[in-house]
From Swiss-Prot:
Low-potential electron donor to a number of redox enzymes. GO terms for cellular component: membrane. This is Flavodoxin. The lineage of its organism: Bacteria, Pseudomonadati, Aquificota, Aquificia, Aquificales. Keywords: Electron transport, Flavoprotein, FMN, Transport. GO terms for molecular function: electron transfer activity; FMN binding; NAD(P)H dehydrogenase (quinone) activity. Pfam families: Flavodoxin_1. The gene is fldA. Gene3D superfamilies: 3.40.50.360. It comes from the Bacteria. The keyword Electron transport applies. Residues 4-159 form the Flavodoxin-like domain. It comes from Aquifex aeolicus (strain VF5). SUPFAM superfamilies: Flavoproteins. Transmembrane segments: none annotated. Its cofactor is FMN.
Amino acid sequence: MGKVLVIYDTRTGNTKKMAELVAEGARSLEGTEVRLKHVDEATKEDVLWADGLAVGSPTNMGLVSWKMKRFFDDVLGDLWGEIDGKIACAFSSSGGWGGGNEVACMSILTMLMNFGFLVFGVTDYVGKKFTLHYGAVVAGEPRSEEEKEACRRLGRRLAEWVAIFVDGRKELLEKIRKDPARFVD
């Protein structure tokens, strides 16, 4: 059974709403156990427990929040070398479009790669011209169905990669590749 940790920081509640949708998406794959934790509550033990990690941060001047950076420095720093090969992805909410949330996601992915995480983007489209290559991004709270689906799709894909690479469920790979719902006309 795959184990997914969704960790987030939030100032206004918007990134928390995204995190809840990411967790919902991960739970949609049968056999996936999910923990949802605010960055202030997440521990080393949570990270060691998880096979996959979804990290969400509000965008702060185009970057991650200071609390999320502190988590990487103070909590994950103690796990250097122990968490290589876990699977991870990113999501972020900004105050408005163009607020830097894709850059924040890339910052999260960069930090994860430094710890040896295997990171991924999602090639699917959840709406016309609406994709999540670097992670799920939203301006404000996720209101539209495309924004909500982007979060759920990210969590689902994390659970699928964990199932494929950790649990050996290779049959899911062809299902992902051939799913006609991945692309919107």
